[in-house]
Amino acid sequence: MTDRIARVERTTKESSITVELNLDGTGIVDVSTGVPFFDHMLTALGSHASFDLTVHAKGDIEIEAHHTVEDTSIVLGQALGQALGDKKGIRRFGDAFIPMDETLAHASVDVSGRPYCVHTGEPEHLLHSVIGGYPGVPYATVINRHVFESIALNARIALHVRVLYGRDQHHITEAEFKAVARALREAVEPDPRVTGVPSTKGSL
């Protein structure tokens, strides 16, 4: 299996993003987006997926975090898709249940080449909650869905994320990110019994 690494850069009038990703890493993570809670979530994602992940982002956070979070998620998805390459020899499917105190979240991944995202189960108060920002730039949890959609669509994977139950917005969001991390880790792992692309069609 060839090196599964990627480096993607994206610059717009709203942000400048660089992501470096190694799917066969050991969880070495260096993240700086200017949004402390998002840094915390991306660090959890890389660590629990055992990816080596570097994210450097500069955006118009003086307006709010939305553009930076959105654009970083797009570039992360692009890097994931690029690092996957021809997808030969991978498990393809992965899923994980992650508890965090009162919260339980679940994620399922299919490295299918058919981009899709389902995000469900978050309590309604997460539409209006913010985390952090005292000091620092706050993270509005309403963007959780958009983060996962952006990763899935740009990586060309099917990603389902659901919250089975929970109350605390921090616990819910963190459990979701960790569930996605563990599901991705399983899905992209090499399977010694798979010699080609894991599809009856012969391609993904």
Curated annotation (Swiss-Prot):
This is Imidazoleglycerol-phosphate dehydratase. Its EC number is 4.2.1.19. One of its GO terms (cellular component) is cytoplasm. It catalyses: D-erythro-1-(imidazol-4-yl)glycerol 3-phosphate = 3-(imidazol-4-yl)-2-oxopropyl phosphate + H2O. It comes from Rhodococcus jostii (strain RHA1). It is found in: Cytoplasm. InterPro entries: IGPD_sf, ImidazoleglycerolP_deHydtase, ImidazoleglycerP_deHydtase_CS, Ribosomal_Su5_D2-typ_SF. It is an enzyme of class 4 (lyase). Signal peptide: none annotated. Keywords: Amino-acid biosynthesis, Cytoplasm, Histidine biosynthesis, Lyase. Pathway: Amino-acid biosynthesis; L-histidine biosynthesis; L-histidine from 5-phospho-alpha-D-ribose 1-diphosphate: step 6/9. SUPFAM superfamilies: Ribosomal protein S5 domain 2-like (SSF54211). It comes from the Bacteria. PANTHER family: IMIDAZOLEGLYCEROL-PHOSPHATE DEHYDRATASE, IMIDAZOLEGLYCEROL-PHOSPHATE DEHYDRATASE HIS7. Belongs to the imidazoleglycerol-phosphate dehydratase family. Pfam families: IGPD (PF00475).
